[in-house]
């Protein structure tokens, strides 16, 4: 009876360990997929400062989030991920297509130009593609997305965005790293 209990305990430990290893391997696979997806998206020819893409990977399924300026970009991103990232089972999109608007386009261009041409922000202008600060405009309302190097740069980008005529509000989601 004692041998049976010991054997049962060892079996339970082994099964728990194997189950944990399987979950860890799946997690690792998703992490590898996420790194590859990030690479594909960052280098995509259609990814501009006027779009913002986030994603999650769960059991090999990639789900895209964010905003883009044109609907064709979503299909292009999905095709690139499926073509260049092994082990992706499916790509889903929950992305928002920003409304077409001449006024928003004008605001978008001026804000990005002013941010990337400000002497204090030049290090972001010469950064590798894609640029680290993304300017999302919807009905005159700006959302800044991306990453900057300091709290001061975050506030400066917001101040530059607020100074543009036609801007109704600015939401600053820039992360400081």
Where are the predicted features?
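N-terminal targeting leaders
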Residues: 2-8, 16-177
């Amino acid at each position: 009876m004692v041998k049976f209990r010991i054997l049962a305990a060892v079996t339970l430990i082994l099964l728990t360990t194997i189950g944990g290893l399987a979950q860890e391997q799946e997690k690792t696979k998703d992490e590898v997929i996420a790194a590859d997806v990030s690479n594909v998206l960052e280098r995509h020819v259609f990814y501009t400062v006027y779009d913002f893409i986030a994603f999650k990977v769960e059991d090999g399924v990639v789900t895209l989030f964010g905003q883009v300026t044109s609907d064709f970009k979503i299909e292009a991103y999905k095709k690139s991920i499926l073509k260049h990232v092994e082990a992706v089972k499916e790509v889903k999109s929950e992305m928002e297509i920003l409304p077409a608007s001449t006024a928003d386009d004008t605001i978008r261009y001026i804000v990005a130009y002013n941010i990337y041409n400000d002497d204090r922000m030049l290090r972001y202008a010469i950064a590798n593609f894609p640029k680290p600060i993304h300017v999302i405009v919807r009905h005159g309302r700006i959302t800044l997305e991306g990453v900057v190097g300091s709290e001061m740069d975050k506030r400066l980008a917001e101040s530059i965005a607020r100074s543009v005529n036609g801007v109704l509000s600015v939401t600053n989601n820039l992360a400081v790293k």
